[in-house]
Amino acid sequence: MSLVYAGILSHAPGITGRAHLALDKTIRDEFYAYLTKQRKDIESSGAESLIVIAAEHFANFFMDNMPAYCIGIGEKHTGPIEDSEWLKIEKTTIPGAPELAIRLAKSVMHSVDLAYSEEWQCDHGIMVPLSFLTPNYDLPVIPCNINCQGPPLTPLARVWQFGEALRRACDEQSEKIALVGTGGISHWPATPDSGKINEAWDRNFLDQLMNQDKTKILSYIDEEVYQEAGQGGFEIRTLIATAAAAGGKGELQFYSAELPIFAVGCTVARFDVGQ
């Protein structure tokens, strides 16, 4: 049945770990409401598995071994790797979809070199989204990582090719598959600038992404992204891959820069997948 849903959302640890510290609880709750809507949209699509394209934070890979792309093919995944009290998410086991993941990996490998892992430890980059999108952790999950942490980073044109390859792989399957890309827009995690958000930059990027303006999307330069959107801005790769996989235009359902305690521009959007 192929890809039945594609969307994006933010994943900063403060979204769950510092929820009680948000000064504007009205905006916080509106953000949460749109995350709930995203969960319901995924459920309504009939998705049997969920691919999560994320940017992990040295939970599984470090500078001694940093693949550009990796897919989790294990029967189960564990998380969060961080302290549960800090993240406000209990440690749990998440079901995988190994047979489907292997089929997807074999297909993607015809276009993009792809590493794989049978043992995946989920950090906040996956656990925060899952805590909203499958709070009972009963939907099989296939994690995918794009290196957004340790330069040299994979080129954006290659990210687009990865997204297109993943879509082709999904369309070859009989299962109904949902896909979300999760990362920051502008954010400066673990720095003195933590909490800073470049709203103008975010909105410009999101407008280009929703309109599938491939030329502009692929014209971003890492050095400029770093200056305008922080080191967390490199995570636009997860969102770009999702847009490429979807193929259709997007709908920005929620964006706010008014929750600095979350230290990220809070975003929820979905794309037309052409079904």
Name each model-derived stretch.
Residues 1-48, 63-160, 172, 193-275:
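Flexible, D/E/H-enriched segments
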Residues 11-13, 54-59:
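Short glycine-rich, polar/acidic loop-and-turn segments at beta strand-coil junctions
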Residues 48-54, 144, 175-183:
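Beta-strand elements within well-structured catalytic alpha/beta cores of enzymes
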Residues 56-59, 183-187:
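Short, internal active-site loops enriched in acidic
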Residues 149, 163-166, 186:
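Glycine/proline-rich loop-helix segments at beta-alpha junctions forming the active-site rim
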Residues 164-171, 175-177:
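Non-transmembrane, aqueous-exposed alpha-helical and coiled segments at domain scale
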Residues 177, 190-192:
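Short conserved catalytic/interaction loops centered on acidic-Pro-aromatic/His motifs
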Residues 186-189, 228:
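Short, conserved secondary-structure transition motifs
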